[in-house]
C-alpha cells in the first residue's frame, strides 16, 4: 500500500514537473527571477490579501456597497424624496476609489501578462534557434502554415496554457469564494425572494442565447451567405499581395486581364452577399436585439408581478434583483472556467511536446569542446534519411548510404561532386551537425560528433550554401553575419576578396593602361584581337590586309606612308619646324622600310574567315585612340606616361613600329600569332593593378558615372589633353570609402540596403555577399562552399574568387571543401575529389588518379563516354575539337 501511494505521488510529481506552467516558471527562474516573483505576487498573493482586508480595501465589498447605494439614490429620486447631498458625494467618491483600485489591479495584471507573453515568445525563439532543423515541423502536419503563422500559433498556445494557470485558476478560486459568500447572504433573504425574480434573469439569458443561435443558423449561416462573410475579403488581400510578388511574371505572360477577371469574380460574390435579402433580415434582427425590446417588456411584467405578490417597493425589488444577478454572473464565471479545462487540455499536449524539445544550451553543457582541427572522418556505414513528416504511410528512403570512408585533413583542398540529388548538400549538413546520421558516425580528431558540442563544430566549420539567406539591411550588415565583431577594414577586405566590387568591371581602364605602357612595342601591321579593335574603329587609319604576295612590298610601303602622313595631319599646326622634321623622318622611315621589304621574301598575310576576324592597327591609331580612351574613361586617374610631346615622340614610335614590322614579316604567320599571344599576356599582366585602383574602378562602374569632359577628336593639342585631364581629375567625385576615425563613410556599395532574401539584387551578387562572410571569419578551419559560386560569372571566379580564396585558406591554414558542377574550374586546383552517386561515395582521389582508374561516374560527370589512355582531360578536349 505504501509503495503504491509512493508510486502515485511520484507520478503526480513528475506530471506537475512536466506541466507547461512548471517548465515556464523554471525558465523564468533561470532567465528572469524578478518577473517570476511579480507573476506569483500579482496573480496569487495580492488577490488573496485584498479579499481578506476590510470592506474599504476589498473590491468585492466596495462593489456590493455601491450597488446598494445606487438603488437607494435612484429610488429616492423616483419617489420624489428629499435630496441627500452627502449620500451622492459618498457614492461619487467611493466610485472613484473603486475605479482606482480596479485599474491598479488590472494594470498590474496587464503588465505582468505582457511580460509573460514576451518571455514566451523569447522562449519560442530560443527553442527555434537552438533546436534540431525541422524540430517544429510536427505543428505543420495538417496545414502548410508559414513561419509567421507558426510563431503565432506556438506563442498563442503557450500563452493560453500559461494564462490558464496564472489567470484562470486564480480567478476560479476567487469566483468560488465570492459565489459562496454572495449566495449565503442571498439565502438569508429567502423569505422575500419570489421565484419569478430568480427565473427572470435566467429566462432572459436563455432567450438571448436562443435568439443568437437562431440568427446564426437561419440567417447568417444559410447556404447563400455562410462563406461570404470574411473569406472573400481575405481572398482579395491575398490576391493583391500575390500579384505584387509575382508582378513581373504576370506582365511578361500578359495575365493582367486574367487577374482582373478573378478579382471581379470576388467582388461580385462579396456584393451579392452584401446586397442579399438575408443581410437585411440579419441587420433588422440585430437592431431589435440591441434595443432590448423583449427584455424590457419581460422585466416590466415581472417587476409588477413580484412587487404585487411580495408587497415590496421598487427599491427592495431592485436591490434583490441586483443581488440575484450578481450570483448568477458568478455562477456563469465558474461554468466558463470549468469549461476552459477541456480546451486547455489540447494546448497542454502540444505545448508540452514543444517545451520538451531539447536545445543546444542544455546539450553543450555536458559535451566536449574542440579547439583545433586535426582530422575529420566519415565512417563507411554512414546512412541518413529524411523523416516523412507529412505522410506516415510513405516510407523514408535513405538519402545517403556512403559505403566508403571519407577522410579530410588540414590545409587541403577537396572537391565534392555528383549529379543532382546525389546527397552532396545533405552530407554537408551532416558535417555541420545540422542533422544527425541515422546510422554510422562522423568524428573529428577521433572524437564522435555525438560527444562534441554543436557550438564547437560550428566554430570550426564555416558553411556557405547555394541559396544563402540575405537578411534585410545593408550589405555590410550581411557580411558581418559571419563575424559580428568584424572591423570595417576587415569587411572591406572581405567584400573585395568575394567579388562584391567586381560585378561590373571596366575593361577600358585596363586597356588604357596597357596602351600607355606598351605603345613602344606595337607594330603598325600587328593583328589585334576583336576585343581591342572597337577602340580603334573611330580612326580612319585601319587598313584591311590582302592575300596577294606579288605586290606585298609596295603595299607595305604605301601603308606606311599613309599612316605616317595621317599621323602628321592629326598632330599638325603646333609649329612648322616640327612638321618638316616629321616629314623628313617619315621619308627616311619609308625608305628604310622599302629597302628592308625588298630584301625580304614576301609572306602571305593571314586573313581569318571566322566571325572573330582580326583587324590591323598601326602606331598612330593606337596613340590617337589612347588619347580618346584617356578623355572618355570614367574609371581612373589618368596615366601621364601617354602624354608629353606627341610630335617629338612620333619619330621614335614610327621607327620602333617599322622595326617590329620587319620582325613580324620574318616570322610569318606563326610569328604574328605569337605576337598576338604576347600582347594578350602583357595586357593581362597590366590589368593586375593595385587594390586601391581596383576599388576605384569597381565602385565607379557600379554607380555608372560618366566622364564630365567631352570626347576628344584628333584636332586638339597635347596641352589641351593635359588640361582636360586635370579638369576631369578635379571634377571627379571622391567615392572611395574614406576611413575617418576608424569608420567608413559614404560607401556606395557596403551601405546599400537589400531586401529580405536579396530580392532587389542578382543571384551572383547575393552569393558574393554570402561568400564574403567566410573572409571575416578566420577562426574556422574548414570552409564548405556548397555551390556557393554557381551563379557567378567565370571571369569573377577565375580571376578574383579562386586566387583570393586559395590565398586566404593558405594564410589561415584552412581546409576547403568545394561542391560544384563546374569540374573544369577545380579539377586541377584541388588535392582530392569525392564523387557521390545516388548517396554513395563511388570514387575518390585526385583528377589524374580518377582518370587512370577509369572512374566511370567521374567520366560521366566530365561528359566523356570512354577512357583515353595516357591522355589528360585537356588533351582529350583538344583531340575532340580536332
Swiss-Prot record:
Top-level lineage group: Eukaryota
Location (main, coarse): membrane
Compartments, as annotated in UniProt: Membrane
Keyword Ion transport: no
Pfam families: ABC_tran
Region (Disordered): 522-617, 634-669, 710-730
Signal peptide residue numbers: none
Record's compositionally biased regions (Acidic residues): 715-724
Topology class, membrane: Multi-pass membrane protein
Family: Belongs to the ABC transporter superfamily. ABCH family.
Official protein name in the record: ABC transporter H family member 4
Species this chain originates from: Dictyostelium discoideum
